[in-house]
Amino acid sequence: MSQDTEVDMKDVELNELEPEKQPMNAADGAAAGEKNGLVKIKVAEDEAEAGVKFTGLSKEELLKVAGSPGWVRTRWALLLLFWLGWLGMLAGAVVIIVRAPRCRELPVQRWWHKGALYRIGDLQAFVGPEARGIAGLKNHLEYLSTLKVKGLVLGPIHKNQKDEVNETDLKQIDPDLGSQEDFKDLLQSAKKKSIHIILDLTPNYKGQNAWFLPPQADIVATKMKEALSSWLQDGVDGFQVRDVGKLANASLYLAEWQNITKNFSEDRLLIAGTASSDLQQIVNILESTSDLLLTSSYLSQPVFTGEHAELLVIKYLNATGSRWCSWSVSQAGLLTSFIPAQFLRLYQLLLFTLPGTPVFSYGDELGLQAVALPGQPMEAPFMLWNESSNSQTSSPVSLNMTVKGQNEDPGSLLTQFRRLSDLRGKERSLLHGDFDALSSSSGLFSYVRHWDQNERYLVVLNFQDVGLSARVGASNLPAGISLPASANLLLSTDSTRLSREEGTSLSLENLSLNPYEGLLLQFPFVA
């Protein structure tokens, strides 16, 4: 191809590209020199010159204006208004603080003050015949956490040959129930669930005398001291000893054991148990040492009238004074072994709302009965987890008697237990509030729990086998505490009353209760 031809081709390519540089909307007569995308704007010089340029006042001009009488008066007025407003707010805050009611100082509370304790006296009966002791218990910690219990009283589970003091080792786990490693693993797992482990160290639990024979007291005392120190080092949160009424010099030994636990940590608990229901004997044991928790058979007396229940509770509180109480119907055993079935729901409500620590045995949340089923051990029935729990007999187990069945029933005894345990652990009036019994109709036991400016709780228990309408009186309340005309329902032990839903407002002038029904009502603090 010639040189001229090459030049012509280049010109063609340039001519083809040139239209791309033209404006898309250019008119036919547009100047050829304009470029695509470039817009030139010509601003008239006279229009720019017409604009006013503001440069502000000079320093001298500002000082002159600011010093004028008008601006001086304005500044002083604004300054005076600011300080008057500030002083007014300060005075208002002082008045509010002075006139506001003083808050009561919260008492020091340990973990056992904040909820219920749950006893598992027979570990194998609790986990079932096919599970293995301590390892089986670990699998049920999730269930125990749903009960909102603060402590688990376990055992005894130590090595004990019946009536043989030298063959009893309080520092070793019974091999039939597990190993030391199993127990340490249980402690760690329970800690993650915020459940404290209390170990029952009643020495001769398989024998006739829980404390062996009187001449062997010194041997037992030495073993106890060694065991307490050893288990505390392993992380146990407390100890229980039962039948202290059968222990010679019980007051001396209890004081010594309490010192060992408290010297290790103030957050360690010692529980004593007695089969006695005599109030004076109970007080004598309590006076042996401070901060001792005592379970007894005091409430196992026939208290199946409201008047008798009120008398027993008030006598106990007066006798124990400012001591922290615990409430149970026995040192061991099920509620159903002491309380007729129709009173079980009432007693749950009673124990959870009295001032002190409620103590229950495994199965109390279900209404488990010691002799209800063929094949059940009389003193330690198997925990009924499901219909097949009682595998040692062919007799069927009713679903509504099991954990599985009651879990699914909003009106079950288990549901009531969980609700009460939850309230007991988070409401200040129930945690550490004052207790005042009320004047009420015959057959009723009613009382108020209150703390400072927190929500108040009214408990009304009908121990009669007939329904009644009652007026709850406030004549026994101290100054500054009064009852409203109505209160809101939190819980009724009668799950058949569908018309009484939580939050229903009930008149205290004419309060209707069914036979054996208990009510937990709530009303606010009013200054």
Swiss-Prot record:
Residue numbers of Phosphoserine PTMs: S2, S58, S300, S421
Stretches for region Disordered: 1-31
Record-annotated membrane-spanning stretches: 76-98
Pfam families: Alpha-amylase, SLC3A2_N
GO MF: aromatic amino acid transmembrane transporter activity; double-stranded RNA binding; exogenous protein binding; L-alanine transmembrane transporter activity; L-leucine transmembrane transporter activity; neutral L-amino acid transmembrane transporter activity; protein heterodimerization activity; protein homodimerization activity
Keyword Phosphoprotein tagged: yes
Ranges of Basic and acidic residues composition bias in the record: 7-21
Ranges in the topological domain labelled Cytoplasmic: 1-75
Phosphothreonine PTM positions: T5
Superkingdom of origin organism: Eukaryota
Tissue: In brain expressed on capillary endothelia in cerebral cortex (at protein level). Highest expression in kidney, jejunum, ileum, colon, placenta, testis and spleen. Lower levels found in liver, lung and brain with weakest expression in heart. Expressed in retina, inner blood-retinal barrier of retina, retinal vascular endothelial cells. Also expressed in C6 glioma cells and in the retinal capillary endothelial cell line TR-iBRB2.
Function: Acts as a chaperone that facilitates biogenesis and trafficking of functional transporters heterodimers to the plasma membrane. Forms heterodimer with SLC7 family transporters (SLC7A5, SLC7A6, SLC7A7, SLC7A8, SLC7A10 and SLC7A11), a group of amino-acid antiporters. Heterodimers function as amino acids exchangers, the specificity of the substrate depending on the SLC7A subunit. Heterodimers formed by SLC3A2/SLC7A6 or SLC3A2/SLC7A7 mediate the uptake of dibasic amino acids.
Family, as annotated: Belongs to the SLC3A transporter family.
Protein name: Amino acid transporter heavy chain SLC3A2
